[in-house]
Amino acid sequence: MLNFGASLQQASEGKMELISEKSKEGAHPWDKAEQSDFEAVEALMSMSCDWKSHFKKYLENRPVTPVSDTSEEDSLLPGTPDLQTVPAFCLTPPYSPSDFEPSQGSNLTAPAPPTGHFRSLSDAAKPPSIAPFKEEEKSPLAAPPLPKAQATSVIRHTADAQLCNHQSCPVKAASILNYQDNSFRRRTHINVEATRKNIPCAAVSPNRPKPEPSTAANGAEKAGTAPYDFAVPSSETVICRSSQPAPTSPVQKSVLMSSPTVSTGGVPPLPVICQMVPLPANNSLVTTVVPSSPPSQPPAVCSPVLFMGTQVPKGTVMFVVPQPVVQSPKPPVVSPNGTRLSPIAPAPGFSPSAARVTPQIDSSRVRSHICSHPGCGKTYFKSSHLKAHVRTHTGEKPFSCSWKGCERRFARSDELSRHRRTHTGEKKFACPMCDRRFMRSDHLTKHARRHLSAKKLPNWQMEVSKLNDIALPPATASAQ
């Protein structure tokens, strides 16, 4: 009985110790999981309060990490402390900013703001073991600032366009649209003032370590949410031209840059032309035309084309780059005298002579009969013609008239036949139009010319000629 009572007393004492330990643990304000949740909510509340006031300072002081790049969408985080409205995938890399480190001793992954901007309210309640971590976290801010290097992440922008939309991440999408709308209004106002003053949007001087402040450079920095830093070699100029923004899609912008070709032989290279091309969000196909002016000299290397924008479109981006046409200058046509000629008319002396087809000469029509009399060199086709010509030199007249009482002689037979017609009165050459007859063929030919010319004359001249023919016989009769 005594042993049983002792065992009951020991069991009751063990139960009391367990209850006291549970009461002590229950008296603690929060456990580790609840403490990490409170820290995450407190960090989000601090971010929403100090985000807008320290926006520019945050952009300047945030370091570059390989986890995420510094595009303009990194700075547009949700401004509400409610953790239930933000999905978990929007707070994990590559969606979370690069310098938001997870706090130690917490099982929940939550972005922590940079300690240089604010101090959390739970620093006094944290154990002393976390203090060295905070001191190490503050130490990188005292180091010299790293040079700016900014790029474009295809993975981030593609995932943002597909995952973080109004349904999945409404707070982030609303803040992005609101901030980009304000930046677009400032950009259009600055572009209008720049076009009025005929000042380029940005001028990059590669030889200076820090660009001097100017109105054009300040306007370019205010226009974009995140400035673009290009590594431009020496002796090059960057000229930005902004096209007319599309009224339907003021959110998305893009920069079209054509880099210059490599210059050889001391020739200054072509300028780098950047043009702002608006991209509509609803179109599945985006076509971009790269304007290029004909260079004075043919380029040796084809110039590459770079496409950059705030967000990569979902559709296909096509680059239509015109090929440079090299026109060989033609030398001006100069005549042998030294005068310039028009390229329309052919130059005299330079036109190729057309191959003329020479007709084959008949061997019977060659003037092979040459007169051998000194001082004469006439040629004839026939030997009979040469004999008749030689008679003119010798004076020989073998053909004599047989008419009674006529003793005339002739060197040629045709002359004798013509002379005989004068005795007989024969006129064997008749005109087919007026029936007039002639003794000689040459007389008929001369008469036929009158008929041909009469057809061309007007009627009044024909009448005058007829009157003259009528008036001539009385005059001749009176003269006789």
UniProtKB/Swiss-Prot annotation:
Signal peptide: none annotated. One of its GO terms (cellular component) is nucleus. Ubiquitinated; mediated by SIAH1 and leading to its subsequent proteasomal degradation. Induction: Up-regulated in response to glucose. Residues 1-32, 64-83, 97-146, 202-222 are annotated as: Disordered. SMART domains: ZnF_C2H2. PROSITE patterns: ZINC_FINGER_C2H2_1, ZINC_FINGER_C2H2_2. The keyword S-adenosyl-L-methionine does not apply. The modification Phosphoserine is found at S183, S249. Residues 14-32 have a biased composition (Basic and acidic residues). Keywords: Biological rhythms, DNA-binding, Metal-binding, Nucleus, Phosphoprotein, Repeat, Repressor, Transcription, Transcription regulation, Ubl conjugation, Zinc, Zinc-finger. GO terms for molecular function: core promoter sequence-specific DNA binding; DNA-binding transcription activator activity, RNA polymerase II-specific; DNA-binding transcription factor activity, RNA polymerase II-specific; RNA polymerase II cis-regulatory region sequence-specific DNA binding; sequence-specific double-stranded DNA binding; zinc ion binding. It is found in: Nucleus. InterPro entries: Znf_C2H2_sf, Znf_C2H2_type. The keyword Transcription applies. Residues 1-12 have a biased composition (Polar residues). Belongs to the Sp1 C2H2-type zinc-finger protein family. Transcriptional repressor which binds to the consensus sequence 5'-GGTGTG-3'. Regulates the circadian expression of genes involved in lipogenesis, gluconeogenesis, and glycolysis in the liver. Represses the expression of PCK2, a rate-limiting step enzyme of gluconeogenesis. May play a role in the cell cycle regulation. Plays a role in the regulation of the circadian clock; binds to the GC box sequence in the promoter of the core clock component ARTNL/BMAL1 and represses its transcriptional activity. This is Krueppel-like factor 10. The gene is Klf10.
